[in-house]
UniProtKB/Swiss-Prot annotation:
It comes from the Bacteria. GO terms for molecular function: aminoacyl-tRNA deacylase activity; ATP binding; valine-tRNA ligase activity. This is Valine--tRNA ligase. Monomer. The gene is valS. A motif ('KMSKS' region) lies at residues 534-538. ATP binds at residue 537. Its EC number is 6.1.1.9.
């Protein structure tokens, strides 16, 4: 069957992905081989493929395919995350578009809509990953809301509660007024914004005097319950024991003393609003102050907001400033740079809010996780993230794990009374009934008497169990799969979730398995555009990944992504990289077509040039294999690709095939051809992890194969000793061939015309590749001489000199004139360099590196002048 003249990526990709799936190559079962396990960072169930996913999953697929080739039992577990906040927001928006308010639905009715949405839109991203070539074990696909996954989450919550690590507390939390839920500290992004500092006047009760406070949030004065001064501040001695009156609401509040107050900030007087600032809450607890919450869940003002009730906080800010000014309570307004917290999920400005929430104590759980990473039990790649990790973990705060959402794992706390502590925690309702009966002493208590906590658990509370729960390691901690596949080998993820997810998985691993969840954490960079901007929908600078695959092929896009993606460093994405990857695909395909197009003869002896070429490439291949293995061991995936790329493009296509190809219209000997095919197959093996489709296509085109002989499960090349000498010898020969080609090109000497060639072998260079030089330079006669050759052009390679007689081939006088011009220019250049180097001030004061460069220029110019003079002499 004829080989297609052009590579059809779409056709090839569909064909081989279906073939791999049909033959179950991606599936893993427990056996006696060494396992290699990766769990996918589960994308949001309703998400779609973006460039970050492309990079992350390409790297994972490279690692998994290489492990498979190395004979390991490769298991890559895919799945999706239920993404409470994001998914609920989408469902609420959908319902709103249909004229349905979430608040008009029961929880069960809302969840029915959420599940319908998830079934309709969920998992699209996993299908998209198949277009990339991801070789996940799709039979193992998990979803964080699967029954067994949910049961694992609930079991862990109950266990941690019984250990005293999970508790319910009335705390200041981060409130997202758009999503109407709490967020953990790690889900809040802080940014500096230009704002205002308002100086407000509070009347001192019983006098006509005023004190002034400075605040960035004048709307919160309606929740003030004290003014605080520093007891050491002599300016306010007269205020001790007095009271102040809050403007607008006319509430009388005490003036308290506490050294917490910074005497240098603002006016030195601090308004205390315990419901809306964590530090104020601490002061309030210390001084037994009232707590007045002025906000509704959507950050509009409630009835404590008086005539501002129902208005948004920022609208109220503007209006209350006008009112304060109108009644003479506004002293002045200053520009002020303020640090503002925003929701990572919605972008809304976070509102500190007091609320009953569930928390997980982290300090104790963090200790083994700190030790594991700092003690090299777990490796972070690159290591630059170690300090970030250590800082986070050593300053860890209790994790707020409850969210005011319906979509997610409902907290398994059941209330049997109206008191805050009238609850039991249990895995099931039936167990809760039994516990509640025991606690209350009421044997008649029924399930209908219990009310389950309405809140859901933070999404991360399910995904922190991911490496264990995908193998059912929580519900059945001794099952054969968790014992075999856990701990996993590598985790490939983004640095921005190093604490959100990675650190928490490590904590969970030590808590529930007593060991690490993975050995290595490869932290990818952020995909940015050429202007270094993060790719985003809002900027419109993110290309459609599937569109790129359609245009350049999956292999081309994979190569393009990896060519510039060193671990932990941001990738400056340029579509030209995908174009380069596509060009590489075509290069490989055309090289294969060239090889398959040769006529083979069993009667011809193997030429010595072919034998040398095979020996050289075999050594070069083995040297590259060592480089590649070293890169892989250090997770320098981009470097491993580049080594492979150069080997195949430069050494195989540009040199090796040219060295062995037969003359025009002539057949090739069978022995050489067999070696060429064997070499090609080895090339395909090391290239397969990066470019799975084109390599499988060529592998299957070489000869008919059974499913057991597919490239995807072939054997990775074995490292062997290699001849370094032959590599060095060919390196010299390649420079000689390049010199011959340059002269042919510069002097318009057709390659069809044979030339004589003389060598002044000052270096006593080996003659190993003389036959190759003759073949690739179309040299009729190669001889060694002891002196310069008259009437010849010459060039140097290191200290050797090479001569090509040009009698009758070129216009000698014109050539002499050209050489003289180049000689004059080079001598002038040398004078300018000498002048610089003779300047003692320059030599003594310039950086050593700069002086060294100038000296190198001088040496190069002198060598060139000598060669040009020799060429002139030979033409005389």
């Amino acid at each position: 069957m004829a080989i297609a003249s052009q590579y059809n990526a779409k056709k090839v990709e569909d064909k081989w992905y279906d073939y791999w799936m049909k033959n179950n190559y991606f599936h893993s079962e427990v056996d006696d081989r060494e396992p290699y396990t990766i769990v996918i960072p589960p994308p949001n169930v309703t998400g779609v493929l973006h460039m970050g996913h492309m990079l992350n999953n390409t790297i994972q697929d490279v690692l998994v395919r290489r492990a498979r080739l190395k004979g390991l039992n490769a298991c890559w577990v895919p799945g999706t995350d239920h993404a409470s906040i994001a998914t609920e927001a989408k469902v609420v928006a959908k319902l709103k578009a249909e004229g349905i308010d979430k608040n008009d639905l029961t929880r069960e009715e809302f969840l029915q809509h959420a599940w319908e949405w998830t079934h309709k839109h969920g998992g699209i991203i996993l299908q998209q990953l198949k277009h990339l070539g991801a070789s996940c074990d799709w039979e193992r696909t998990k979803f964080t809301m699967d029954d067994d996954m949910s049961a694992s989450v609930i079991k862990v919550f109950v266990d941690l509660y019984e250990k005293g690590l999970v508790y319910r507390g009335y705390r200041m939390v981060n409130w997202d007024p758009q999503a109407k839920t709490t967020l953990s500290d790690e889900e809040v992004n802080y940014e500096e914004r230009n704002g205002k500092l308002y100086h407000l006047k509070y009347k001192i009760d019983g006098t006509e005097d005023y004190l002034t406070i400075a605040t960035t949030r004048p709307e919160t004065i309606l929740g003030d319950t004290a003014i605080c001064i520093n007891p050491n501040d002599e300016r306010f001695t007269h205020l001790k024991g007095k009271k102040a009156i809050v403007p607008i609401c006319n509430r009388t509040i005490p003036i308290i003393e506490d050294e917490y107050v910074d005497m240098e900030f603002g006016t030195g007087c601090l308004k205390v609003t315990p419901a809306h600032d964590e530090n104020d809450k601490n002061l309030g607890d210390k001084h037994d102050l009232d707590v007045i919450d002025i906000f509704n869940d959507d950050a509009t003002l409630n009835n404590y907001g008086l005539h501002y009730e129902g208005k948004d906080r920022f609208v109220v800010r503007a209006e209350i400033v006008e009112e304060l000014e109108l009644y003479g309570f506004l002293d002045k307004v200053e520009d002020h740079i303020n640090k503002v917290g925003t929701s990572e999920r919605t972008g809304a400005v976070i509102e500190p809010k007091l609320s009953d929430q569930w928390f997980l104590k982290m300090k104790e759980m963090a200790q083994p996780a700190i030790k594991a990473v700092l003690g090299d039990d777990i490796n972070l790649v690159p290591e630059k993230f170690l300090n970030t990790y250590r800082h986070w973990m050593e300053n860890v705060r209790d994790w707020n794990i409850s969210r005011q959402l319906w979509w997610g794992h409902q907290i398994p706390a059941y209330f049997y009374g109206k008191g805050k502590n009238d609850f039991v925690v249990a895995e099931t309702l039936n167990q809760a009934v039994l516990k509640a009966r025991e606690v209350t002493g009421n044997a008649e208590l029924q399930a209908s008497d219990l009310t389950q906590d309405k809140d859901a658990l933070d999404t991360w509370f399910s995904s922190w169990l991911w490496p264990m729960s995908v193998f059912n390691g929580i519900l059945e901690p001794e099952n054969k799969e968790i014992e075999y596949y856990y701990p996993t080998n590598d985790l490939v993820t983004a640095p921005e979730i190093l604490f959100f997810w990675v650190a928490r998985m490590i904590m969970a691993g030590y808590e529930y398995r007593g060991e690490r969840p993975f050995k290595n954490v490869y932290l990818t960079g952020i995909v940015r555009d050429k202007q270094r901007r993060k790719m985003s929908k809002s900027l419109g600078n993110s290309p459609d990944p599937l569109g790129l695959i359609e245009q350049y092929g999956a292999d081309g896009v994979r190569v393009g992504m990896l060519l510039s993606s060193p671990a932990g460093n941001d990738l400056m994405f340029d579509e030209d990289l995908c174009k380069q990857g596509s060009g590489f695909t075509n290069k490989i395909w055309n090289a294969f077509r060239l090889v398959k197009g040769w006529e083979i003869s069993e009667k011809i002896e193997q030429p010595e040039t072919a034998k040398m070429a095979i020996n050289w490439y075999t050594a070069r291949f083995q040297k590259t294999i060592r480089e590649i293995e070293d890169h892989y061991s250090k997770y320098r995936i981009s470097d491993a690709l580049m080594s492979t790329y150069k080997l195949i493009w430069d050494d195989y296509c540009s040199w090796f095939l040219e060295m062995v190809k037969p003359g025009y219209g002539e057949p090739m000997d069978a022995k050489t051809y067999k070696a060429i095919i064997a070499i090609l197959e080895e090339n395909l093996k090391i290239l397969h992890p990066f470019m799975p489709f084109v390599t499988e296509e060529i592998w299957q085109e070489i000869t008919e194969r059974t499913p057991e002989e597919a490239l995807i499960i072939a054997k990775w090349p074995v490292e062997k000793e290699f001849d370094e000498t032959i590599i060095k010898e060919f390196s010299h020969a390649a420079e000689v061939i390049a010199g011959v080609r340059k002269i042919r090109k510069d002097k318009n000497i057709s390659f069809k015309n044979e030339i004589d060639f003389s060598v002044l072998n000052n270096e006593n260079t080996s003659k190993t590749f003389d036959g190759v030089i003759s073949k690739m330079g179309n040299i009729s006669n190669l001889e060694y001489v002891t002196g310069s050759v008259d009437g010849a052009l010459s060039f140097r390679v290191r200290s050797n000199e090479y001569f090509i007689p040009i009698a009758g081939a070129i216009d000698v006088e014109a050539e002499k004139e050209k050489i003289q011009e180049e000689l004059n220019y080079t001598e002038g250049f040398l004078k300018s360099v000498d002048k610089k180097l003779s300047n003692e001030r320059f030599v003594n004061n310039a950086p050593e590196k700069v002086v060294a460069i100038e000296k190198a220029k001088k040496a190069d110019a002198e060598a060139k002048i000598e060669a040009l003079k020799a060429s002139l002499k030979s033409l005389s």
